[in-house]
Design a protein with these regions (language model features):
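N-proximal low-complexity "stem/linker" segments adjacent to membrane-targeting elements
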Residues: 28-98
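Glycine-rich, basic loop-to-helix element that forms the pyrophosphate-binding segment
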Residues: 137-154
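The conserved acidic donor/metal-binding loop of glycosyltransferases
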Residues: 163-167, 196
């Protein structure tokens, strides 16, 4: 059992397996691939649902300090682009704080706010960090258009996309910066990096 957030109880996903839609998929798979392959595929699916699926273990203080020190030698700068629209205060604060507590600090957080109310602006203004750039957008163009508005103000080497209610683990930017630095040593330029682990 994992005492940290993100834990799912053992076997909690069994209800998903036993749904009628999955039964139909199993019959289709059986007809297409035979009984032996269908049996092994079903067993693998059931076994994977029995396991503890999510168990995030945070960084130790020693690891955080190591990353901070190593990151000082990196040159890459990230522009984190966040479209904001009527975001609840608790979610907005959690997102901002997950960025500000990164072990790699060479970034700018660009918040493009298309909210009708002034509440998100007040929350953002309460943070006195020069890495935060707030831009008010007059017209809400949706997530893509608002993100493009934020991109217009980016000065970093890489643009990072983040939703207004997303969270980053403390080492998310460090992991990206470390990979970019490794590529530089290998005389390779990375055009894009992606991780679905840091949400």
């Amino acid at each position: 059992m994992c005492p940290l957030f993100g834990h799912r109880d053992r076997g909690a996903g069994m209800g998903k397996i036993l749904k009628l839609a999955n039964f139909r998929k199993t019959i289709y798979y059986l007809k297409k691939n035979g009984i032996k392959n269908a049996f092994y595929a079903a067993r693998e699916r059931i076994d994977s649902e029995k396991e503890d699926s999510y168990c995030y273990q945070g960084l130790t203080e020693e690891e955080k300090e190591r990353q901070r020190k190593e990151g000082e030698s990196f040159s890459v700068r990230f522009s984190i682009l966040v479209p904001v629209y009527e975001t609840r205060e608790d979610l907005l604060r959690a997102m901002i704080e997950s960025v500000l507590t990164q072990t790699y600090g060479n970034f700018e957080l660009i918040l493009a706010d298309a909210s009708k109310s002034e509440e998100p602006e007040k929350v953002i203004a309460s943070y006195q960090d020069k890495r935060i750039l707030y831009k008010r957008i007059r017209q809400n163009g949706g997530i893509s258009a608002n993100t493009n508005q934020a991109l217009m103000y980016a000065t970093g080497d890489y643009a990072a996309l983040l939703d207004h209610d997303d969270l980053l683990t403390e080492d998310a930017l460090f992991a990206m910066a470390e990979r970019i630095e490794q590529a530089k040593r290998e005389d390779t330029e990375l055009q894009m990096l992606y991780s679905d682990e840091d949400k």
